[in-house]
């Protein structure tokens, strides 16, 4: 792969934006989710157990342990961490010098600290993915304090940036594999997308239209998903540039389609950011129309010709990938019906055999790719002139190469979860290494949409309140489906974590969601912070004047409406049918409710509130009072609009380069530049003496150097 300086810079810029979104989105929900009287109070996770301070910090690594030393309770410490994280990530988004390893280390520590007390509301795969990506950014980002005069170039950059490609491979490959290993009949029958759009957590309006597409197209889309998630990732580590670029665009197209048809917070955006690892600088600067230097000499021409011949191998490789897809999914064009017919033409046993065969070869191919990057880094370090610079570059190469090998090694444990037989064949030392760092979320296993839920109707919990236990009023949420006539929400990149957990709660008995009892309890109390999670505008909350006396929850099945045979659009987005009672009617002091709360420790009294008159608590209260009325999606969209406005104005009037485009000066050590200049001068003299057009050649070379 060619140079990836701009690709790396784009990755760091994009990750800064993802961090900003994650911190701001979570900040808006802290009082209702984790406050002293929230649904799952965070202070319960920070109880001192008699161990020493540093021992507790080791067991549960979180900056929240330092909150009491600053005069802050747990909730306010979380708010301060979110605000600091948002401010730091905003700075990294706007200023390239802040995209530093130390800055990304702080961002990772901030999010890990929140994750430790997040409980069920932060246990999503994208939270784990952000933590793993964030830690890799610590290795990928430049350490400006150690580079002195060289602010961009380092011999180990290709080694550490390779880890993001490996993470992207594990994410996409596992996401495709688990769909088949789960034995879900909809994934095996290629009908999953006929249910997906209406059964996803928070559909958007485009999901309704996607649901209306013909069945043959939905089945073909599932085949395309397998092709992109299972087949294409196998191309990530092959030495063929065009295959990598094809991999990049296929992955990005898939993520964009998911973004267009669902509200998946920052997950798909983070995946697109990881896709930067498949790009090189030549492709990023393609539209700048840089002229390529003229190659001189038979040796260069021969090498170029050999490279051209080798690069032709990408055509048969791509052809084989398409052939296997057509064969194993029996793709056939039905000209009469103007459709593409498809079916799964292999068995579960066949797939397991293939998976067992392919798992370790993918590891060895990835290891060979990493080894090649390490060798290239060693060569670059050895090419640096000057004893001091050479030693300094070699030392960095050794340290970061060892770190990359260690990260790759421990990641093999969660990666091989796709085939437990392969997982059992890993060396015991690898498992011990993984267990030693597991608490820090450095590496994780992935596999989204393992099984398609909602076959036979989308289950939805509808909460109802009453004053007399006779007349019940539905409590409508801002984002999740409820009223069948309400237009589905568009809230990306915000994640309303209560709405998401309501979707999971509907999939099982209420006993599988202990937090739901606490949620009902807070609504009976009329807790303003919890109500704010349900409706930002209190006037839309049906019990804003007085809390309800009774609350219950009903389980419904929802389906998207359909266009009738005449082509007329329906008046409602949804149709629904009552299934059963999800949670019985309860009231404050109800023995059933009290028993649930006591059983899960959700009725414990919080510790005494700390003084709010100190400077830091006072400042945090002012910020909260200012931002509290704003809906979280509006707050995030305002940030995004403001950031792009700043970049637009800079591009128009400031002459500032585009985001992610690194400046090229000081890209190599000074001695390396002198060597290049010296060699260039000697080459020009030789060319001028050996050619009748020597003067033209020199002028042409100088022109290329300037461009």
UniProtKB/Swiss-Prot annotation:
Pfam families: LMF1 (PF06762), LMF1_C (PF25179). Glycans are attached at residue 483. Its main location: endoplasmic reticulum. It is found in: Endoplasmic reticulum membrane. Keywords: Endoplasmic reticulum, Glycoprotein, Membrane, Transmembrane, Transmembrane helix. GO terms for biological process: protein maturation. One of its GO terms (cellular component) is endoplasmic reticulum membrane. Residues 696-707 have a biased composition (Basic and acidic residues). The chain crosses the membrane at residues 11-31, 78-98, 102-122, 126-146, 220-240, 256-276, 306-326, 358-378, 398-418, 634-654. Residues 659-707 are annotated as: Disordered. Involved in the maturation of specific proteins in the endoplasmic reticulum. Belongs to the lipase maturation factor family. This is Lipase maturation factor 2. It comes from Xenopus tropicalis.
């Amino acid at each position: 792969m060619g140079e990836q300086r701009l690709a790396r810079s784009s990755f760091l810029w994009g990750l800064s934006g993802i961090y900003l979104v994650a911190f701001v989105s979570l900040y808006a929900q802290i009082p209702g989710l984790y406050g002293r009287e929230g649904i799952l109070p965070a202070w319960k996770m920070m109880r001192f157990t008699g161990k020493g301070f540093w021992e507790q910090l080791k067991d549960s690594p979180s900056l929240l342990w330092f909150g009491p030393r600053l005069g802050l309770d747990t909730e306010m410490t979380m708010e301060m961490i979110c605000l600091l994280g948002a401010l730091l990530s905003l700075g990294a988004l706007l200023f390239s010098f802040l995209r530093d390893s130390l800055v990304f280390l702080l961002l990772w520590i901030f999010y890990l600290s929140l994750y430790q007390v997040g409980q069920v509301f932060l246990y999503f795969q994208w939270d784990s993915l952000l933590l793993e990506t964030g830690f890799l950014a610590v290795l990928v980002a430049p350490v400006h304090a150690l580079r002195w005069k060289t602010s961009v170039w380092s011999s180990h950059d290709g080694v550490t940036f390779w880890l993001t490609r490996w993470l992207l491979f594990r994410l996409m490959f596992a996401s495709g594999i688990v769909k088949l290993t789960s034995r879900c009949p909809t994934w095996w029958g290629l009908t999953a997308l006929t249910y997906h759009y209406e059964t996803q957590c928070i559909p958007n309006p485009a999901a309704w239209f996607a649901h209306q597409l013909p069945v043959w197209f939905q089945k073909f889309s599932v085949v395309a998903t397998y092709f992109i998630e299972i087949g294409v990732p196998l191309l990530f580590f092959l030495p063929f540039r065009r295959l990598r670029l094809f991999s990049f665009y296929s992955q990005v197209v898939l993520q964009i389609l998911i973004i267009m048809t669902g509200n998946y917070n920052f997950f798909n955006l983070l995946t697109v950011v990881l896709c930067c690892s498949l790009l090189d600088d030549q492709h990023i600067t393609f539209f700048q129309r840089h002229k390529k230097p003229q190659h001189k000499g038979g040796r260069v021409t021969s090498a170029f010709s050999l490279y051209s011949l080798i690069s032709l191998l990408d055509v048969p490789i791509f052809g084989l990938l398409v052939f296997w897809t057509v064969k194993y999914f029996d793709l056939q064009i039905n000209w009469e019906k103007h459709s593409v017919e498809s079916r799964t033409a292999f068995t579960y046993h066949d797939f397991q055999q293939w998976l067992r065969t392919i798992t370790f070869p993918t590891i060895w191919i990835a290891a060979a790719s990493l080894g090649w990057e390490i060798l290239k880094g060693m060569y670059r370090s050895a090419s640096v002139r000057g004893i001091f610079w050479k030693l300094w570059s070699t030392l960095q190469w050794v340290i970061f190469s060892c770190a990359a090998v260690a990260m790759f090694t421990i990641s093999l444990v969660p990666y091989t979860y796709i085939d437990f037989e392969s997982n059992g064949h890993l060396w015991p030392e690898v498992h011990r290494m993984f267990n030693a760092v597991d608490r820090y979320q450095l590496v994780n296993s992935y596999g989204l949409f393992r099984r398609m839920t909602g076959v036979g109707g989308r289950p939805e919990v509808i909460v109802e309140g009453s004053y007399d236990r006779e007349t019940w009023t539905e409590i409508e949420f801002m984002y999740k489906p409820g009223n069948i006539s309400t237009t589905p929400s568009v809230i990306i990149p915000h994640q309303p974590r209560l709405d998401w957990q309501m979707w999971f709660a509907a999939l099982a008995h209420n006993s599988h969601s202990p937090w739901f009892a606490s949620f009902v309890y807070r609504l009976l109390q009329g807790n303003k912070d919890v109500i704010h999670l349900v409706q930002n505008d209190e006037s839309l909350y049906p019990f804003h004047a007085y809390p309800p006396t009774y609350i219950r929850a009903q389980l419904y099945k929802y389906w998207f409406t359909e266009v009738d045979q005449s082509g007329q659009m329906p008046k409602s987005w949804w149709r629904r049918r009552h299934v059963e009672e999800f949670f019985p009617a309860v009231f404050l002091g109800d023995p059933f409710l009290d028993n649930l709360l006591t059983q899960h420790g959700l009725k414990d009294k919080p510790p005494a509130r700390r003084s709010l008159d100190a400077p830091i608590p006072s400042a945090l209260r002012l910020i909260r009072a200012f931002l509290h009325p704003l809906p979280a999606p509006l707050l995030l969209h305002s940030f995004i609009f403001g950031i792009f406005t700043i970049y637009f104005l800079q591009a128009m009037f400031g002459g500032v380069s585009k985001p992610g485009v690194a400046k090229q000066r000081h890209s190599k050590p000074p001695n390396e530049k002198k060597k290049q200049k010296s060699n260039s001068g000697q080459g020009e003299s030789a060319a001028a003496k050996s050619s009748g057009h020597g003067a033209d050649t020199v002028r042409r070379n100088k022109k290329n150097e300037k461009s």
